[in-house]
C-alpha cells in the first residue's frame, strides 16, 4: 500500500492499524532548535481521545504519545521525528461477524477489491484510529508555525441541526462534548444524538476550521494552491465527503457584486470588507482568516440490518455491533485542525524557501 505520506517540505507519514500493537507517524522537514516534548503534543491528542463522553466510541485508549527520535534535550534536531502511540483497548472479537461480510458504506469492500486482503478488525488501516497520529503531527506543525498563527475548529451541524452563527462563541467550543460554538444548540444536540445512539444508528456532521494570523503570500499559482492542498488534506480524513473554502457552494448563488470582497487602504495597510473567498485568492493567502468546512458521512457501523454480500459472493444482511462513534464528526474537529496546521506549516516552509522570510 502506497500513499501513506503527505506534504512537501513538512512531510508526514502515518502507519499502523486500529487493532495492531501500535500506531505511529514520522514527521520529516521540521526545522531544528524548536522546543518540543510529549507534553506539547499530549493536550491536542486528549481533545481527540475516544471514550470521553457517551457521544463517542467507548473504546478506552489513553493515546499516550512517545517521541522516539528527532528531539534532543527538549529541542528538535532537524532529523525525522518519530512518534508512537500504543493501542491498549482492542476488542477484536466484536468484529468476528464481519470477517467475511462487508459493511455497506465502509471502505473494507474497496480495500478487498483492490488488494485482495483486508484487516476487518476495527477497519484496520481505514479506521479513524489512524487520525490520532495526524493530530500528533499537527502539534509539531503548530510549533513550526509559532504563536502568530491560531487554528481553531468547531462542529457547526449534526444531521439537520445547525448552529446559529449570531450566537457563535469560540470560548464555548471546549466547554461541551461537541466542540459546539453555539451554547443554545448543545442541549438540542444532546437530545438528538442521544436518541440516535440508543437506536444503534449514526448521523453525519459539518466541521468548520479557521486559521487566523496567516500572512499574505502563502501558496502558489496553478498546481501549488494553498486551498487545493488544504482540500486534499481534509478530504483524506476518514468519512469526509465534501469540502468548502470560504463561501464554497453558496457562492454559486451570489452575484459578482455580492461575492466581491471590497478592498481599502487603512493606515497604509490593505484591508478587506468581507471574506467570501475564505482567505485565499488564486491559491495564495490574502492575510484574511483562512476558512474551510468539511462534511462527514454517518458512521457505517450501525445496528440495523442492511443488505450486503460476503467475500464469497453470497447475499446476506449485516448488523454491526461493538463500540462505534454515533457521530464521527465530533472527534473530527481536532483532526481537521491538525490537517490545517500541517498544510500551513508545509506552505510556510515552501514560501520561505522561494521568497525568503
Swiss-Prot record:
Keyword Aminoacyl-tRNA synthetase carried by entry: no
Alphabetically ordered keywords of this record: Amino-acid biosynthesis, Aromatic amino acid biosynthesis, FAD, Flavoprotein, FMN, Lyase, NADP
Subunit note: Homotetramer.
Positions contributing to FMN binding: 125-127, 238-239, 282, 297-301, 323
Pathway assigned to this chain's UniProt record: Metabolic intermediate biosynthesis; chorismate biosynthesis; chorismate from D-erythrose 4-phosphate and phosphoenolpyruvate: step 7/7
Cofactor remark from the record: Reduced FMN (FMNH(2)).
Binding site for NADP(+): 48
One of the Pfam families matching this protein, by short name: Chorismate_synt
Domain of life (superkingdom): Bacteria
Enzyme class at the top of the EC tree: lyase
Keyword Ion transport part of the UniProt annotation: no
GO cellular component, one term: cytosol
GO BP field: amino acid biosynthetic process; aromatic amino acid family biosynthetic process; chorismate biosynthetic process
Protein name per the record: Chorismate synthase
Amino acid at each position: 500500500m502506497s500513499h501513506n505520506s503527505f506534504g512537501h517540505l513538512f512531510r508526514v507519514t502515518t502507519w499502523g492499524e486500529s487493532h495492531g500493537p501500535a500506531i505511529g507517524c514520522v514527521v520529516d522537514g521540521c526545522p531544528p532548535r524548536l522546543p518540543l516534548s510529549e507534553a506539547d503534543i499530549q493536550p491536542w491528542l486528549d481533545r481527540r481521545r475516544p471514550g470521553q463522553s457517551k457521544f463517542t466510541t467507548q473504546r478506552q485508549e489513553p493515546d499516550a504519545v512517545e517521541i522516539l527520535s528527532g528531539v534532543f534535550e527538549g529541542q528538535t534536531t532537524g532529523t525525522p521525528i518519530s512518534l508512537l502511540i500504543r493501542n491498549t483497548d482492542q476488542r477484536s472479537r466484536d468484529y468476528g461477524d464481519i470477517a467475511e461480510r462487508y459493511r455497506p458504506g465502509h471502505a473494507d469492500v474497496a480495500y478487498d477489491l483492490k488488494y485482495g486482503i483486508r484487516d476487518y478488525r476495527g477497519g484496520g488501516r481505514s479506521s479513524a484510529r489512524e487520525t490520532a497520529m495526524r493530530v500528533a503531527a499537527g502539534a509539531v506543525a503548530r510549533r513550526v508555525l509559532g504563536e502568530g498563527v491560531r487554528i481553531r475548529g468547531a462542529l457547526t451541524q449534526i444531521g439537520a441541526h445547525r448552529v446559529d452563527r449570531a450566537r457563535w462563541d469560540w470560548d464555548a467550543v471546549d466547554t461541551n462534548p461537541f466542540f459546539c460554538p453555539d451554547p443554545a444548540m448543545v442541549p438540542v444536540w444532546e437530545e438528538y444524538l442521544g436518541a440516535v445512539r440508543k437506536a444503534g444508528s449514526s448521523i453525519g456532521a459539518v466541521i468548520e476550521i479557521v486559521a487566523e494570523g496567516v500572512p499574505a503570500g502563502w501558496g502558489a499559482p496553478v498546481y501549488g494552491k494553498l486551498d487545493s492542498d488544504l482540500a486534499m488534506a481534509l478530504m483524506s480524513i476518514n468519512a469526509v465527503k465534501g469540502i468548502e473554502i470560504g463561501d464554497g457552494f453558496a457562492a454559486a448563488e451570489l452575484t459578482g457584486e455580492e461575492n466581491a470582497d471590497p478592498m481599502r487602504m487603512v493606515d497604509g495597510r490593505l484591508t478587506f470588507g468581507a471574506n467570501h473567498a475564505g482567505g485565499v485568492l488564486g491559491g495564495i493567502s490574502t492575510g484574511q482568516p483562512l476558512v474551510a468546512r468539511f462534511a462527514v458521512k454517518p458512521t457505517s457501523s450501525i445496528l440495523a440490518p442492511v443488505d450486503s454480500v460476503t467475500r464469497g459472493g453470497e447475499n446476506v444482511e449485516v448488523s454491526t455491533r461493538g463500540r462505534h462513534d454515533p457521530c464521527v464528526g465530533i472527534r473530527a474537529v481536532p483532526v481537521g485542525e491538525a490537517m490545517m496546521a500541517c498544510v500551513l506549516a508545509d506552505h510556510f516552509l515552501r514560501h520561505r524557501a522561494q521568497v525568503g522570510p
